[in-house]
Amino acid sequence: MALRFYKAYTPGTRNRSVADCSGLTKTRPEKSLTRSMHRAKGRNNRGVITCRHRGGGHKRLYRQIDFRRNKYDMAATVKTIEYDPNRNARIALVEYQDGEKRYILHPNGLEIGDSIIASETAVNAVGNSLPLMAMPLGVQVHNIEMHPKKGGQLVRSAGAVAQLVAKEGEYVTLRLPSGEVRLISNKCWATIGQVGNMEAMNLSLGKAGRSRWLGRRPTVRGSVMNAVDHPHGGGEGRCPVGHAQPRTPWGKPALGVKTRTRKKYSDTLILRRRKVS
């Protein structure tokens, strides 16, 4: 996927870029695989905001994605490559030999008309799904299960890719996009290849309104709030934060403080922690 850049005809088009969708199939989504979606807008079941800066945005239909790839030993043909408003990756509509249709994440290099399969004996080709124990060392994978038969949970974002670096006993070692190196059961399945739409990270929205279309509300600095609203607020004019270190809106230390649970079951599976900026 390439990007199209706008000329600065207006302040809103200055530095604005959009995805070039010329390679996508211009069709409505498969009706049997779509459903209406209630958007939580950052609220929990009591209506209390638990995630700030969310709300509004364009109305969307949810596309049901097959993260499990549990239709084994049956080939499927790629019918369309489509835009999905619910994620930055593209999705591909595949049709199996028995006529069933499913959406999958579109891997880079998979074209309309290609054949894919989920099998323990599948060849090492883009789009095929295999258990990690059956993959060769060095292969690039995405849509990785954390627990067998649960469905892919890791490496699903646009352009994301992990690498299989070692096999030992009941576990394989994966290098994840974050830089973390961890062990995963060799019975877990994954899909070969890199998630498509790799230029998504380089998109420039260009104006605030485009963030609102995506359902993102403005983020206000704590230092410009009143003291009742934020630990950094209050004072006459521009003031320091008034604490030894920055604080969250709820008074906890921020910036550089570890928030991971000290005793977590997966600590023994993580060989190298992710890169922390």
UniProtKB/Swiss-Prot annotation:
Major site of localization recorded for this protein: plastid
Name of the protein: Large ribosomal subunit protein uL2c
Entry GO MF terms: rRNA binding; structural constituent of ribosome; transferase activity
Keywords: Chloroplast, Plastid, Ribonucleoprotein, Ribosomal protein
GO biological-process terms attached to the record: mitochondrial translation
GO annotations of cellular component type: chloroplast; mitochondrial large ribosomal subunit
PROSITE patterns xref list: RIBOSOMAL_L2 (PS00467)
Subunit architecture: Part of the 50S ribosomal subunit.
Organism placement in taxonomy: Eukaryota, Viridiplantae, Chlorophyta, Mamiellophyceae, Mamiellales
Compartment(s) of residence: Plastid, Chloroplast
Name of encoding gene: rpl2
InterPro entries according to UniProt: NA-bd_OB-fold (IPR012340), Rib_uL2_dom2 (IPR014722), Ribosomal_uL2 (IPR002171), Ribosomal_uL2_bac/org-type (IPR005880), Ribosomal_uL2_C (IPR022669), Ribosomal_uL2_CS (IPR022671), Ribosomal_uL2_dom3 (IPR014726), Ribosomal_uL2_RNA-bd_dom (IPR022666)
Protein family per UniProt: Belongs to the universal ribosomal protein uL2 family.
Annotated stretches, region: Disordered: 228-254
Record carries keyword Cell division: no
